[in-house]
Amino acid sequence: LLAAAAGAAAGDKCGRNEFQCRNGKCISYKWVCDGSSECQDGSDEWEQTCMSLTCKSDDFSCGGRLNRCIPGHWKCDGQQDCEDGSDELGCAPKTCSQDEFRCAEGACISRLFACDGEPDCPDGSDEASCAPSTCGPAHFRCNSSSCVPALWACDGEPDCDDGSDEWPARCGARPSPQPGRGPCSRHEFHCGSGECVHASWRCDGDADCRDGSDERDCAAATCRPDEFQCSDGTCIHGSRQCDQQQDCGDMSDEVGCVNVTLCEGPDKFKCHSGECISLDKVCNSARDCQDWSDEPIKECATNECMRGNGGCSHTCFDLRIGHECHCPKGYRLVDQRRCEDINECEDPDICSQLCVNLAGSYKCECRAGFQLDPHSQACKAVDSIAYLFFTNRHEVRKMTLDRSEYTSLIANLKNVVALDAEVASNRIYWSDLSQRKIYSAQIDGAHGFPAYDTVISSDLQAPDGLAVDWIHGHIYWTDSVLGTVSVADTRGFRRKTLFRQEGSKPRAIVVDPAHGFMYWTDWGVPAKIEKGGLNGVDVYSLVTEDIQWPNGITLDLSSGRLYWVDSKLHSISSIDVNGGNRKTVLEDEQRLAHPFSLAIFEDKVFWTDVINEAIFSANRLTGSDVHLVAENLLSPEDIVLFHNLTQPRGVNWCEKTALPNGGCQYLCLPAPQINSHSPKFTCACPDGTLLAADMRSCRTEADVILSTQRASTAARPQLTGSPAGTTQEPLTEPTLSTLETATTSQQALHNADGRGSEGTPRSVGALSVVLPIALLGLLCLGALVLWKNWRLRSVHSINFDNPVYQKTTEDEVHICRSQDGYTYPSRQMVSLEDDVA
């Protein structure tokens, strides 16, 4: 009765979404029957408790002892989610639709891919039994029988698999490039396959060109004195030999190693005199150590755990000599005696998304829109299907994650590289390196030949990276030739260069519009990963060490971590958005031979590899479970994951103000949210113009010059005619180039005035009148000075040792006073050379 009363009293304390343990403790219902016990008595995992649970109508019941419930669309998705695999039992065979081709091994591909000259089925059956292809009048027939548009022939870029569209027999001999005008700079090596790589990568033992030409005709490698030469001829640092890790490809660095770590393990005892004996020889009344340290009389006869538990907070374990304090699972020993709880949540990768620390353990939870997979403990999306969009040089393809089958989204492109999507508007954006343009198209109408719009068509050289700000309606892109990062609205009407640096080579870019930041890779010298505000302010480097050729970059918003691939180090790495907690997810020279781009969804990372011509996936937390997603792809480059959860909704502060576009005349750009006092947005003007004094409207440099001249002209009469308290509206200070232009203009005006006054007849008559008046004035002034000196001799003066000066209103100076509280103070360059001159 007492137990029942206590249980009833405790039951009143539990909420509607809580489960009451048998001992009265309250836990969340989502923790019941999840495979780990949160109740101290284990009642949340009892069989009778789990069998009493009922799944929702649209869920699937796994049955068994735990009777777990999973979303209904997880059944027959090719992934085992139930503990016993019952969700993948009794599934109907996969069927292909009418517009799909069924491969011999069962996979489905678009019929457009059958007999197109490229094997898309894993077994190549889509290219078997194909009739010889016939090219239309607007196409060129390659030597391999495939067809490419006739406009692509002899354009300097090989489009046929065998390069026959650029053979000299058809196109003629091409003139050799003049010195200094080649496609690569003097600090780069020109690969035989066309691309440019760092000159320092030539003959470094690692093929960086697609055709491996950077490693041809190289002298035999010799190792330095501080290096170890592997049996295959490669060199590693000497400290890596016998470090219990295989660093040589042939594992020769771990052959013939002698274990010098003696006296380690629970069955060993090290004497004070240096000998190592087995533990069973301690306290056996025999001298095994030279100094008798194995036979201390007092310690051998004492069980320290019998007195006060040996001072241990939890478990005391008696040894032959002394004792040890042990801690239960989930705790650690902090001072050889006391145990404290381990906060497992300090590891950012301990959980898929959210981590809840508990006494002695932890719990993983998921954000809204995701559900925890009871089998893999991964957070999986519960709503719409996720798609992978990737570029295949001449087209954009779409792949479903649950079937790994793809269709053509946009075909007949020249050299598509960068790609991104706007989920809410169902629109994709891409850049074409050959056309030097950025395009967009509606996904609904994209069935191989969609109508697409030209967004940016000028002032582009190599738009290698592209990112869409889905909250504020902007696109950001990089240009590795110009060394710039730029922004424009999604229609391309308004654009601005945000970042430009000599020698930089920005490549991939990703944005976080909710917090106002962008991140991009730069494989210039030195290589780095940069971070800056979406309005172009506060740019600094996040990663500068252990990085050589950073290519693709992506941001996992759910965990707040950046992931990037390094094509030189053959690795996938990650950091938090502030540059800390760096981790290497995966290193693999085979499957990361030349990674180009990557994407994140749920617990998987997907990447494209140019050399393997494939798409791979792996666990983003551990780097394990590497799978081949798609193969036989022609130059797969950018990859984007399309799902509504990858682009969560946010507030567009530029549209929340009373004035449209935030009151900005040109562009309203989100500002980085560094702290709670950060502005929500700032205004920006097109290249070659400046913000006006109101920090919202724009004006040209010519307007600045005229304003400067007017201010200097109006200032002269103010010295005598203006009241002391009068102030003028502050003007935006001109830049250095503006100052030089203003100086030149004023000098020209001065010269013009001088030329206009030369040779005037009136000047002679005026001079004859002014000179007598001036002489008379000087005589009067001299008489006045003599009279004042005579008066001062008869006046006694009083001197104050500590004079006090009263400040008047003429001394007030207002510096950088802004009329808009949501703007940054303008950064201007001041030159002292003009003052010195």
From Swiss-Prot:
InterPro entries: 6-blade_b-propeller_TolB-like, EGF-like_Ca-bd_dom, EGF-like_dom, EGF-type_Asp/Asn_hydroxyl_site, EGF_Ca-bd_CS, Growth_fac_rcpt_cys_sf, LDL_receptor-like_sf, LDLR-related. Residues 788-837 are annotated as: Required for MYLIP-triggered down-regulation of LDLR. This is Low-density lipoprotein receptor. Residues 788-837 are cytoplasmic. It holds the Pfam family Ldl_recept_a. Residues 301-340, 341-380, 650-699 form the EGF-like domain. Glycans are attached at residues 143, 259, 644. The NPXY motif mediates the interaction with the clathrin adapter DAB2 and with LDLRAP1 which are involved in receptor internalization. A few residues outside the motif also play a role in the interaction. LDL-receptor class B repeats lie at residues 384-425, 426-472, 473-515, 516-559, 560-602, 603-645. SUPFAM superfamilies: Growth factor receptor domain, LDL receptor-like module, YWTD domain. Keywords: Cell membrane, Cholesterol metabolism, Coated pit, Disulfide bond, EGF-like domain, Endocytosis, Endosome, Glycoprotein, Golgi apparatus, LDL, Lipid metabolism, Lipid transport, Lysosome, Membrane, Phosphoprotein, Receptor, Repeat, Steroid metabolism, Sterol metabolism, Transmembrane, Transmembrane helix, Transport, Ubl conjugation. The modification Phosphothreonine is found at residue 720. It comes from the Eukaryota. Disulfide bonds join 14-26, 21-39, 33-50, 55-69, 62-82, 76-91, 96-108, 103-121, 115-130, 135-147, 142-160, 154-171, 184-196, 191-209, 203-218, 223-235, 230-248, 242-257, 263-276, 271-289, 283-300, 305-316, 312-325, 327-339, 345-355, 351-364, 366-379, 654-668, 664-683, 685-698. One of its GO terms (molecular function) is calcium ion binding. A motif (NPXY motif) lies at residues 800-805.
